[in-house]
Amino acid sequence: MNITLILFLIGILGFVLNRKNIILMLISIEIMLLAITFLILVSSLNMDDIIGQTYAIYIIVVAGAESAIGLAILVAFYRLRGSITIEYK
């Protein structure tokens, strides 16, 4: 469980510290989702329950769909602005 906490904190730090790069923000969100998935899998194996493994597969599918949608939005953003950096004013 310590590994999942470390992974989740790395994802949060990556999201907070890289506020200008959209790709790094998406990668940080994926790291957070995979940390939660790993925690659910470890808990499922400790409790000897198959439901947690089913939830983990569901989370991985949702994370893949989220990545595809995020990258599609990123391509549209790049075509509109010509850059993927976010400018705060």
Swiss-Prot record:
Superkingdom of the organism of origin: Eukaryota
UniProt function note: Core subunit of the mitochondrial membrane respiratory chain NADH dehydrogenase (Complex I) that is believed to belong to the minimal assembly required for catalysis. Complex I functions in the transfer of electrons from NADH to the respiratory chain. The immediate electron acceptor for the enzyme is believed to be ubiquinone.
PANTHER family associated with the record: NADH-UBIQUINONE OXIDOREDUCTASE CHAIN 4L, NADH-UBIQUINONE OXIDOREDUCTASE SUBUNIT ND4L
GO molecular function, one term: NADH dehydrogenase (ubiquinone) activity
CC annotations in GO: mitochondrial membrane; respiratory chain complex I
NCBIfam families for the chain: PRK05715.1-2
Protein name per its UniProtKB record: NADH-ubiquinone oxidoreductase chain 4L
Organism: Neurospora crassa (strain ATCC 24698 / 74-OR23-1A / CBS 708.71 / DSM 1257 / FGSC 987)
Record's keyword terms, sorted: Electron transport, Membrane, Mitochondrion, NAD, Respiratory chain, Translocase, Transmembrane, Transmembrane helix, Transport, Ubiquinone
Record localization: Mitochondrion membrane
Alphabetical GO biological process terms: ATP synthesis coupled electron transport
Listed InterPro entries: NADH_UbQ_OxRdtase_chain4L/K, NUOK/Mnh_C1-like
Major localisation: mitochondrion
Family to which the UniProt record says this protein belongs: Belongs to the complex I subunit 4L family.
Organism lineage string: Eukaryota, Fungi, Dikarya, Ascomycota, Pezizomycotina
